Amino acid sequence: MNNIITILCIMGGLILLLSLLPKNSNFLDIRSIFVQHFKVFRGNRSQFFSIFIVPILFSIGIVQIRCVDKDILNNLNIVLSILIAMFFSVLSILSAIDGQTRRDKYQQLLTETFTTTIFEIILCLLLLLISFIVLFIGVFEKTVILKIVSGIIYYLTIVVILNILVIIKRIKVLFDNK
């Protein structure tokens, strides 16, 4: 029974992912958000490496210590809900900043910060979706699948935390140069 549920969840996730990735989609163009976010790291491979590659090492290490369980996922869901609300608040603050009267670099930083915040919302929603699916399936025996899913959850969580630091730094620069 659990194998059928797992297969259905994987198939549903893949179909959903494929429906969100088409280029120039008027529904939700996640691809362009990801491309714009990764352009922020253009010319600075060390920051890209630190924010997106190093967390792989951390997540592999954490999975060896402990896979996700019901308690971890419940706490993560609470934190993610708070973060999503916070990111929407940050978006409203960024929208209120008038970047048109500023110089080009200020406007570029404002746009990049806005894009990074949207990227964070998407990561949090993805993490929340994965977390809910694992909770609904409710199988927490140490299997290869649980280790892989735990690694993905830990990886995305670390990436979210590191990107929060990027957003904080950018918002500070925006307000210092106001």
Task: Name each model feature, range by range.
Residues 65-100:
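Transmembrane alpha-helix detector for multi-pass membrane proteins
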Residues 9-17, 150-169:
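Alpha-helical membrane-embedded segments
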Residues 14-29, 87-102:
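Membrane-water interface of transmembrane alpha-helices
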